Amino acid sequence: METFSLKDCSSVASSPISSPNISTLLKIKVLSWSKETGLPASVHVRVCNKSFNLHKSLLCAKSGYFKEREDQLSEIEIPQEFPGGAETFEKIMLFIYGCPTLIHPFNIAGLRCAAQFLEMTEQHSTGNLCERFDLYLNQVVLQNWDDTLVVLKKCQDLVPWSEDLLIVSRCIESLAFTACMEILDPERRREKPVIMLEGMVNQPWEYTNIERIINQDTWIKDLTDLPFEFFKKIIGSLRRQGMKERYVSPLVALYASKSVIPEGQTNTDILQRALDLLLTRDKAYRFVPVGFYFACLAHNLKHDTVLKLQDQIVSLLHTAQPENFIYPKAGNRQVAFSQELLTMESLFSVYVSTESERHLTSSSSNVRVGKLWDIFLSRLPYDQEMKTTRFIELIETVPMSFRESHDQLYLAVNAFLQVHTNISQEEKGSICSYLNCQKLSQEASLELVKNEKMPLRLVVQALFIQQLNTHQAFKDCSDSFRFTNSADFSGSVVPSSRPLTSQQSPCTDDETGPRNRPLCFLMQKDATLDEFESTSFRIHNLEEQLVSLKKSLHSHDNLKKPNCLGKRSASRNKNTFGQVTTACIGSVSFTSQRKYANRLLQILRRVNLFGSRKTNRSKAGESER
């Protein structure tokens, strides 16, 4: 047998960076003790198919377990459930023989459980192993986040010993307290806001987005990497210590998401249990985006859980994104009655029923839901097996009062007609009867007019609506330049020399968006602003001339001479405007009156000419396009 000196044993065992062969060190210590005392190793201990020859006197002095078996035979069998196995037993024996034992977060949990199994407490020896390990746990391990995580993960293989000795609970409470401090720390909040999921409301619930959020905070990443049983205890401790639900619920959602996405790696059992943590809390759904619930709904869960998920989705449906929806797989010949479509139809139907009971049919949330449903219909992978009646049922799932705009509904109808090319005109008319051309934007109307799949009657309606919009736009534009303070001529006021700005013009876009713009402006929007400014200036000049003529006529009526009643001949005087004034209205000649009328007609012709030129330009623009 190869020999080693005690000096080598001590130096190797105490070195923090070396990895000594524990079995060899133990053999050295046993041989050294036998030489020093002259006593042989009289006890044969067997642990997990590994045997050790040890001294009974040392074992009984340190361990209550061996002391109770002192009168037994010289061979002792340690049960298979001994925590830590043979390797941990060797480290415990090194301590008994006086060799310094390397203690670190990776082995402290196993050593503490093994010491408890062997009853190495203060009752049998002062400064025994149980007390030393507890001191190391409390003053070293639990003061550090990373060390606590290491010990907690090691405790997973030491259950129930680690739980009975409160190692798990101490680690849980320490981690939860540190997490609360991370959120409450004002300095940290200034430098880096606490991670929540508000930013995910307008984003699809995808793996890349979830992974990015998890990796932004170390403490969130560490907690979501824990085994579920420990994570569950962490959540309970966070709630007991007062962490707000707005932080706890997103943490549960992130943990559950790791078992849902990416696809093909779903752990349904963990997902089910994680959802139980979330769905049992009142109002916890407020802090989790609806996309998470849609992602969970696509998996095989218990019926009760599915019902709870649907309730959460219905309450948050107006905040959903089309990317969050579950769609039938492309190529599925049973799209009309696929599970995905039936589920989505049920969700929207429940929402409509709930809102109908509350008599809220025109709220912004309902308008949002109506648009989402039409978007969903426009993205369905339609097949020829879907009947027209089934498609009409889908349209009627959401009432028409929920639809302020029919743009998305038009896209859905168009998608259906593109696949069903052989349906009758009667069926096509039934489907298109749900479209209201007055609720289509200019872009959608223009596309509808060009779409050969649309019925001719609908195309004519769209053209008629656009003509009305164009006529109204010209009327509004004309009315905006009238004078409003003159009762005799046109009821308008002399405008200022400054032309109207684009913000003041009724012909430019406003907050209502492009939906209310007439078709002519859509087709000429590149030249609209320049044309408006030029038109404004020309009309301004024309109206100044009209006002000048009106003043001249008034002056002519009011200027009379006192002796005009008895005279047929009148002296004529011209004013600065070149207009004739007379002593009496009856003395004005027919020639002068026709002169004034001709001037008025010329001005009116110029106004009419302006309107015809604008119409010609509009027609020219349409022909070019």
UniProtKB/Swiss-Prot annotation:
Residue ranges, compositional bias (Polar residues): 494-507
An example Gene Ontology biological process: protein ubiquitination
UniProt xrefs under InterPro entries: BTB/POZ_dom, NPH3/RPT2-like, NPH3_dom, SKP1/BTB/POZ_sf
This protein's UniProt keywords: Ubl conjugation pathway
Pfam families, per database record: BTB, NPH3
Region annotation Disordered: where it falls in the sequence: 494-513
Limits of the BTB domain: 41-105
Record keyword Oxidoreductase present: no
Metabolic or biological pathway, per its Swiss-Prot or TrEMBL entry: Protein modification; protein ubiquitination
Domain NPH3: 217-469
PROSITE patterns: BTB, NPH3
Chain's role: May act as a substrate-specific adapter of an E3 ubiquitin-protein ligase complex (CUL3-RBX1-BTB) which mediates the ubiquitination and subsequent proteasomal degradation of target proteins.
Family to which the UniProt record says this protein belongs: Belongs to the NPH3 family.
Domain comment, as recorded: The BTB/POZ domain mediates the interaction with some component of ubiquitin ligase complexes.
Protein name: BTB/POZ domain-containing protein At5g48130
